[in-house]
Amino acid sequence: MPSRKKLHLISLGCTKNLVDSEVMLGRLKEYEITDDNTEADVIIVNTCGFIDAAKEESINTVLNLHDERKEDSILVMSGCLSERYKEELQQDMPEIDIFTGVGDYEKIDELIASKQSTFSPEVYLATETSGRVITGSNYHAYIKIAEGCNQACSFCAIPSFKGKLHSRSLSSIEKEVRMLAEQGYYDFSFISQDSSSYGRDMDLKDGLIDLIKVVEAIEGVRSARILYLYPSTTTFELIDTIADSKIFQTYYDMPIQHIDDAVLKTMKRGFGEQKTIELLEHMKSKPNAFLRTSVIAGHPGESQRSFEKLCSFMEEFGFDRFNTFHYSNEETTTAYQMEQIPQDIINERAEILGEIAERSTLRSLEKMVGKTVELVIDGESDEHEYLLSARPLQWAVDIDGEILINDTSDLPVKYGKVYEAKVTELVGMQLLATLIKEC
């Protein structure tokens, strides 16, 4: 019997990209997955084209894999970078055997068989029939609820290659979640470019609220959270619905990008300082709420005074987590033609915001000491073989950190199972906890 061909796949960028990578894995089940790229018959890099750093990572990854690939292997470049720069890349990168963008993930097996590059005009949106292979977890899955975005933020090129908002039907989402719940998945993260706009293209007034109600009724779903809310499409009613839900975590991930009115106007965010703060305060007023956001350092028009105002707000408000992005000047965006802030000033501002973010996270972690939390054990810790890595169910996967279990109370430990635990201490930026019981 001939040995199976081997596949090496790297998924770069966001979790939305990961879902598309999982669709490709589902179409290539006859291949054996290998971590060793030098022995792979097919190598796929699902690229990110969001900002300069991501573009650079994508190109470097592809070129490094090409240098190490075995003879007669097939190298595929898919995803956002490939879509965004399809003409230039096909001309400048003869190392690549197959180029494909954001429309053909479900046809990847056909493209490899015919060794043909294709760019479909429609953006692909995974459904319950995609046959994706969930990676990295036996209990958690990302559910993509929409593609594209109707916002017109000055700094963002995503609508230029992902198009307008295109939502999945509620029944499609319900079927996928139900199917995964029947397979034992119980924790779900709902994602898109602008999740709070979900359903607006289908004339659903409160699409996300409708989705919450549907998911709450699915047997086997224990926990869920929504990522990527957008201020101008987030309502007080949505905030209340999330807080009142028995299934959805009181978890608010809403990138604000800035807080100064003048900068927000230049960014074309559609919401000013006052309305943004009203939303954030309403979120923060909910019992045990967790708030995550992101900001941009050095957008054109950000004066020193605007920046200092942002710093003061981020220091004082009390976010549990926030990310800082260096402003990246992207062609096809309206900010591209604006007068740019020097890179050294952008770097300096981003560093200051990064330090504020660390202090903000530390204060959030300190509040957890002494609390009893529900957490799921993911496996042995990378820090120490005698410690276990766990994640509170409220936190998002990968981005919010881990809690280390240093005392199991002699309970039988099962990876992927939920336990009640008491957080006992904070060492540096690392929380430690003791298991109390299996839930």
From Swiss-Prot:
Named cofactor requirement(s): [4Fe-4S] cluster
Iron-sulfur as UniProt keyword: yes
SUPFAM superfamilies linked: Radical SAM enzymes (SSF102114)
Keywords: 4Fe-4S, Cytoplasm, Iron, Iron-sulfur, Metal-binding, S-adenosyl-L-methionine, Transferase
CDD domains, per the entry: Radical_SAM
Keyword Membrane set for record: no
Domain TRAM: 366-437
Domain Radical SAM core as annotated: residue spans: 135-363
GO term, biological process aspect, one: tRNA modification
Annotated catalysed reactions: L-aspartate(89)-[ribosomal protein uS12]-hydrogen + (sulfur carrier)-SH + AH2 + 2 S-adenosyl-L-methionine = 3-methylsulfanyl-L-aspartate(89)-[ribosomal protein uS12]-hydrogen + (sulfur carrier)-H + 5'-deoxyadenosine + L-methionine + A + S-adenosyl-L-homocysteine + 2 H(+)
GO CC terms of this entry: cytosol
MTTase N-terminal domain residues: 5-117
Cofactor note: Binds 2 [4Fe-4S] clusters. One cluster is coordinated with 3 cysteines and an exchangeable S-adenosyl-L-methionine.
EC number of this enzyme: 2.8.4.4
Subcellular location: Cytoplasm
GO molecular function: 4 iron, 4 sulfur cluster binding; aspartic acid methylthiotransferase activity; metal ion binding; protein methylthiotransferase activity
Gene3D superfamilies given in the database record: Methylthiotransferase, N-terminal domain (3.40.50.12160), Nucleic acid-binding proteins (2.40.50.140), tm_1862 like domain (3.80.30.20)
Signal sequence bounds: none
Positions bound to [4Fe-4S] cluster 2: C149, C153, C156
Positions with a binding annotation for [4Fe-4S] cluster 1: C14, C48, C80
Superkingdom of the source species: Bacteria
Record function comment: Catalyzes the methylthiolation of an aspartic acid residue of ribosomal protein uS12.
Family statement drawn from the similarity comment of this UniProt entry: Belongs to the methylthiotransferase family. RimO subfamily.
Record-linked NCBIfam families: 30S ribosomal protein S12 methylthiotransferase RimO (TIGR01125), MiaB/RimO family radical SAM methylthiotransferase (TIGR00089)
Protein's recorded name: Ribosomal protein uS12 methylthiotransferase RimO
Species this chain originates from: Sulfurovum sp. (strain NBC37-1)
